[in-house]
């Protein structure tokens, strides 16, 4: 009898392992291959060799990049150097990046590890750059003021909070206020492993301001990119491992109400909102397994989606760019400016194409 119970228990454990392994492979799109979609006049951005995980384009074409992210379990082509914030002018004929000096002596640059970024422009046209950083595997939001004439960033403040143990991306709604996607990737390797493997949906979205901090949405399988509609009425949230983008209605008290969900056959990463049309541009991982288990002989591909009329009954989803990793590995973000598409990656290069 004891032997029978033991064999039954072993069988149940093996079945559970097999089911979770299958689910894990499905959530990571382990077996999907890329169907190439090309764009004209694509050129690699000069000066980016260790990733452009996130980017923000200002109305005048100046563009911020976060680069050099050290991400647990993810490839790094420059592991010994701290991260940087880069600047590029998309109005130049052959744009190239330069590193922004960080002023103020209040930030430890040796442990600077920039991740998601977001900008806020106030009534005086002062530009604030909010940067998620992971010094020593923790999470902070670093607040900077952009000094355009000096081409530098003035560090103003470091934000930490117990509800923000492992921030992924942010959407600024003020100089020190933002929505943040929050997972367990940096918080604890043990939690991270279980969350990734079992799909425990532990991720959430937090609203932060100096006066109030609260969880405004939860139950996500790896909450990732986040963006806000042009009219400020809706918040878009990418659920990476569920292959979904959620649309939430934003209220005057900063709470969120779920409105609709779109599903895809790719892992959706950062979300950029078209400043003219309001369309969503999404950097995606067609095969997420290759991101977490890097092989130079079989590198992760890249994919960019454009979502038009997302609030309608029948949104239009277009694969604008797709590539098998020969040119661009591990796309995380895409944004547009005057007929150009700028594409960034978690650890590789960045690409600029004509639309």
Swiss-Prot record:
GO terms for molecular function: acyl-L-homoserine-lactone lactonohydrolase activity; aryldialkylphosphatase activity; arylesterase activity; calcium ion binding; phospholipid binding; protein homodimerization activity. Keywords: Calcium, Disulfide bond, Glycoprotein, HDL, Hydrolase, Metal-binding, Secreted, Signal. It holds the Pfam family Arylesterase. It comes from the Eukaryota. Plasma. Associated with HDL. Binds 2 calcium ions per subunit. Ca(2+) 1 binds at residues 53, 168, 224, 269-270. Glycans are attached at residues 253, 270, 324. Its EC number is 3.1.1.2, 3.1.1.81, 3.1.8.1. Its cofactor is Ca(2+). GO terms for cellular component: extracellular space; high-density lipoprotein particle; spherical high-density lipoprotein particle. Homodimer. Interacts with CLU. PANTHER family: PARAOXONASE (PTHR11799), SERUM PARAOXONASE_ARYLESTERASE 1 (PTHR11799:SF16). This is Serum paraoxonase/arylesterase 1. It comes from Rattus norvegicus (Rat).
